[in-house]
């Protein structure tokens, strides 16, 4: 898997920019707020059709423009793919693969696989449960693009069910009886929540089971065999057997237990939208007691495990996007990460300086300067020599 070219038009602070990626490793160097992260965000959009920085396409369109466009040529094991994504300021997208408009944009998922690692990923450990749910969901979409539809179906069911529960809450507040038709509607949506929720929770469990031994091995290596990582999936629906009927029944049983509380609160209190994932180091919860260094080691191990798992399942190494992350790692962890990458993964790295990179890395990298949304080849000082 190789991103050969990228063309941006009116995307963020880029007006018109074309990039030919001429090396396995590309370093984007520049001061803050020049557009380094914006370029990585464009690649993230190609991989996941969303960005961790905003949920509004209007934020992605250059100020004063009506549309933005991202075009890319991607080399896969099965051939070359032309990817064309048009974003509109007023909403609505058009996605083309090899010139053909996709009726369902989710069909574009899986064309490009990428793992992003930024300073914001420390929230994986110290942030709330929603950060960890979003993390595992994003990984599962990379591994199995159909999971995006499964997740979308669940969220639609959740939205409809919550609307009914809000109606029930108003009736409770007014001390009015809940009409039979509302009770019947809720029963139907209970069944839908159990059916769609079981698909989400079972896939999350299986994904974490596959990821955990890889993350544990990386964590032991990075910590010089001094620490043991444990990842525990804590589903909101307690289930013991990986069987759809068993999980659905477990969900319905818990809904029945929490029915009065849900109607009083006006929202769904049962389902995978309330799942938690816990990380512990040597038996101690990393979220509350892990040092900053331990938390960074944990996230680094998770990212390396993601790369390994995606490569194993997809059969091709994904892209790696490193957004100003080297500054967050000490020299030992920097070396661990850079040594692992080498030429195995196509890598795009943003940085404000080149001090973290060895001579061999710089010699075999494409280095681009980013300045106010414009890319230029890095002008190496005459004193810089990276060998013959």
From Swiss-Prot:
Transmembrane segments: none annotated. Gene3D superfamilies: P-loop containing nucleotide triphosphate hydrolases (3.40.50.300), RecF/RecN/SMC, N-terminal domain (1.20.1050.90). It is found in: Cytoplasm. Keywords: ATP-binding, Cytoplasm, DNA damage, DNA repair, DNA replication, DNA-binding, Nucleotide-binding, SOS response. Pfam families: SMC_N (PF02463). GO terms for cellular component: cytoplasm. It comes from the Bacteria. The keyword Transcription does not apply. ATP binds at residues 30-37. GO terms for molecular function: ATP binding; single-stranded DNA binding. One of its GO terms (biological process) is DNA replication. HAMAP family: RecF. The RecF protein is involved in DNA metabolism; it is required for DNA replication and normal SOS inducibility. RecF binds preferentially to single-stranded, linear DNA. It also seems to bind ATP. Belongs to the RecF family. This is DNA replication and repair protein RecF. It comes from Picosynechococcus sp. (strain ATCC 27264 / PCC 7002 / PR-6) (Agmenellum quadruplicatum). The lineage of its organism: Bacteria, Bacillati, Cyanobacteriota, Cyanophyceae, Oscillatoriophycideae.
């Amino acid at each position: 898997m190789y991103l050969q070219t990228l063309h941006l038009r009116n995307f963020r602070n880029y007006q018109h920019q074309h990039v030919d990626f001429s090396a396995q490793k590309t370093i984007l160097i520049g001061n803050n707020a020049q557009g380094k992260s914006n370029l990585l965000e464009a690649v993230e959009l190609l991989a996941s059709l969303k960005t961790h920085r905003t949920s509004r396409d209007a934020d992605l369109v250059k100020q004063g423009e009506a549309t933005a466009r991202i075009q890319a040529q991607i080399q896969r094991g099965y051939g070359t793919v032309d990817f064309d994504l048009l974003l509109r300021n007023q909403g609505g997208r058009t996605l083309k693969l090899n010139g053909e408009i996709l009726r369902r944009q989710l069909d574009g998922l899986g064309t490009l696989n990428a793992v992003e690692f930024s300073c914001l990923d420390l929230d994986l450990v110290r942030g709330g449960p929603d950060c960890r749910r979003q993390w595992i969901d994003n990984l599962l979409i990379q591994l199995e693009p159909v999971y995006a539809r499964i997740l979308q179906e669940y969220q639609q069911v959740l939205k409809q069910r919550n609307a009914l529960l809000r109606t029930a809450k108003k009736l409770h507040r007014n001390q009015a009886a809940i009409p039979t038709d509302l009770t019947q509607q809720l029963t139907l949506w209970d069944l839908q929540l159990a059916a769609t929720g079981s698909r989400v929770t079972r896939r999350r469990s299986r994904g974490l089971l596959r990821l955990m031994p890889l993350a544990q091995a990386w964590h032991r290596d990075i910590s010089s065999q001094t620490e043991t990582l444990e990842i525990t999936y804590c589903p909101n629906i307690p289930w013991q057997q990986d069987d759809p009927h068993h999980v659905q029944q477990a969900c319905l049983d818990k809904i029945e237990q929490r029915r009065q509380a849900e109607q009083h609160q006006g929202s769904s209190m049962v389902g995978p939208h309330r799942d938690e994932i816990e990380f512990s180091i040597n038996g101690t919860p990393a979220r509350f007691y892990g040092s900053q260094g331990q938390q960074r080691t944990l996230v680094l191990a998770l990212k390396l495990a993601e790369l390994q798992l995606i490569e194993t399942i997809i059969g091709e190494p994904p892209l790696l996007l490193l957004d100003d992350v080297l500054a967050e790692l000490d020299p030992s962890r920097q070396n661990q990460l850079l040594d692992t990458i080498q030429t195995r993964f196509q890598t795009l790295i943003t940085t404000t300086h080149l001090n973290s990179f060895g001579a061999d890395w710089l010699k075999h990298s494409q280095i681009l300067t980013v300045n106010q949304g414009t890319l230029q080849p890095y002008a190496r000082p005459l004193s810089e020599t990276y060998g013959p």
